[in-house]
Amino acid sequence: VVGRTVEKHYITAIDDYVARTKHFISFDMEVIPELKNTKSLSAEQQKEKEGELILKALQPGDVVVLLDEHGKEFRSIEFADWVERKMHTVNKRLVFIIGGPYGFAPKVYEAAQEKISLSKMTFSHQMIRLIFVEQLYRAMTILNNNPYHHE
């Protein structure tokens, strides 16, 4: 995740879903600090600098999935099935990346194995973090037959 979550109500909800998700899988949310003094940077320059920080945080063998508006969309059950397949085929870390406000640098796209989209709608970066961790938790409950998800 590029930049920290600042809204208190989002922080509380995100922390809750992260804790719930950890009952099922090993899960951490790593935050890459927001860039400082970006007013003098173009959107492309900002993406490049964020991209450098993102790539530096990756480890060899990571399977990188970008949360991107042009990525594949899933229904919740389809996403759960996709996550399950990844959990059985990925030997290292499965890393989901939420970029900055302008998206990703070309080098980050090159490092990614897949792109997924949570919606065709646009959400704030604060909100998308919450939506993603809720969907990951929902996927875990679907896979474990917990009564959270209703079709």
Where does each model-flagged region fall?
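N-terminal beta1-alpha1 ligand-phosphate binding loop
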Residues: 1-21
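Conserved nucleotide-binding/hydrolysis micro-motifs of P-loop NTPases
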Residues: 5-7, 35, 71, 102-103
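Structured adenosyl-cofactor binding patch, chiefly the S-adenosyl-L-methionine
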Residues: 106-150
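S-adenosyl-L-methionine/SAH cofactor-binding core of RNA-modifying enzymes
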Residues: 26-92
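Catalytic beta-strand/loop module used to bind and position nucleotide/cofactor moieties
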Residues: 68-70, 75-107, 112-123
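Conserved RecA-like P-loop NTPase ATPase core
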Residues: 65, 99, 132
